[in-house]
Amino acid sequence: MKMNNLRVVIITGLSGSGKSTALRALEDIGFYCVDNMPVVLLPQFLEIQSDKSKDISQVAMVMDLREKSFIETYKGIFEQIKARGYKIEIVFLYATDDALLHRFSETRRVHPLSSVSIMEGIRLEREQLRALEEMADKVIDTTSCNVHQLKDIVQRHFLPSSTARRLFIHLISFGYRYGLPADADLVLDVRFLPNPYWVESLKSFNGHHQDVRRYVLSAEASSIFLQKLFDLMEFLIPLYEKEGKPRITIAVGCTGGKHRSVVMANELWSYFSGRDYPVNVNHRDVGKS
């Protein structure tokens, strides 16, 4: 059986145990996340991600009793997925009855088994999910956890020890003609660099091509810019980490998002990955004409 490289994490557990917080923690370290994914759609979803989204290497989703058929179908679906070569990691969250009751009282949320009292719903849900808890690869007791502590536990588990608790860095290359990325924390304009678009032999290639990369980096302005940029990152990133910021998005833009911004975003990726930061890069406009 051929193994699939897509990393699949299923977050499940008792209502009120912190599943949404755990999902956000994984999103902050680069997982593609989906809340309340119907389990019957999981095989199709994973096939689409494997075939069409090569930039996505890890996905996480919350599945629980909000889906009425979950209990009857999850075991067969999980076995089907594993038979196709996917490795599923199940994270099960729980807390004591008193802690869950207190959280429901604080938030005034309705328990999914709302036809009974909250306490009876907690008891029934715990009973129905017992077999799933026994299947789990990681079981987390959130009774004494606040939001920040739970996020830390989840991220420590899924990040290598060298990157745990480090700021996650998301890089985007883009073209100004298509608009700025809405979620950018820092925007770097590299339109001052020599443009391969005006070189006939380079025009049709993008910033991943070695000839384009060499052309852009051969400019004196490029080497000076990168050195000053790396100095800035060395100053800024530890300060963001000290403030507890979990994630930063750095956007690098040129005119069309095909040449200069791609080269510079890749250089930044090499810089951060070489220092063991969790980092990914998305070349938003590289395929546009």
Swiss-Prot record:
**Known InterPro entries for this protein?**
P-loop_NTPase, RapZ-like, RapZ-like_N, RapZ_C
Q: Where are the transmembrane segments?
A: none
Which Gene3D superfamilies does this one have? P-loop containing nucleotide triphosphate hydrolases
Residues binding GTP are 64-67
The entry's ATP-binding residues are: 13-20
Q: Which UniProt keywords apply?
A: ATP-binding, GTP-binding, Nucleotide-binding
Q: Can the keyword GTP-binding be found in this entry's annotation? A: yes
Q: Which SUPFAM superfamilies match?
A: P-loop containing nucleoside triphosphate hydrolases
Decide whether keyword ATP-binding is in the record.
yes
Which residues are in coiled coils? none
Report the GO molecular function annotations: ATP binding; GTP binding
Spell out the family assignment given in the record's similarity comment. Belongs to the RapZ-like family.
Protein purpose: Displays ATPase and GTPase activities.
Under which name does UniProt file this protein? Answer: Nucleotide-binding protein SYNAS_12170
Origin organism is Syntrophus aciditrophicus (strain SB)
